[in-house]
Amino acid sequence: VVEELTRAAMAQAGYFTTTQVLRLGFAASDIGEHLADGSWVKIERDLFRLRDCPRSDLEEFAKWCTWFGAAAAVSHQSAAELHGLGHLYPRFIHLSTVLSPPSPTQQLALHRRSLGPEEVEQVGPLRITTPKRTALDLAASGISQELLDEVVADGVAIGRLSASALQRECGSLPGQVAQRVERALAACT
């Protein structure tokens, strides 16, 4: 059981939840024992980390993705940052999730929705929206046209966004969002 938990936690940058622990067959009393012996560290309510797990640059993202569960994905400005698209310098960690518990911290910006498998990719311990989904999310959000232009131009330049795929997507977008995407595409050609 310990090996199964270690495998699961390592896939999540060392993080795991109370729910995961109990599903693997640990007793509630085991949690206290592992905290007392120092092998587990309590991070937040119902969120723990293996003490000896190596640190990562993706740790803050992994922590919150683990806390919200398998349906959570890094999105919007945070996804753009991780993809290297634009210079948005987000003040919050943006997550898309179907869960609706209140945010446990003010450092999160939650976007409540479900994402299809074609809209996310696995990057190390994280689920993250694809560059295309990220650009579309940003076009629908409140970022400036100049910043959106930069995100789209960077994505096209490094081959992570297809201008033709974004153009095709415009037909199914609300009018104002489609116009913003079209302007961004025009700015990068």
Give a label for each model feature:
Residues 1-189:
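Short gly/ser-rich loop at a beta-strand->alpha-helix junction or flexible surface loop bordering the NTP-binding
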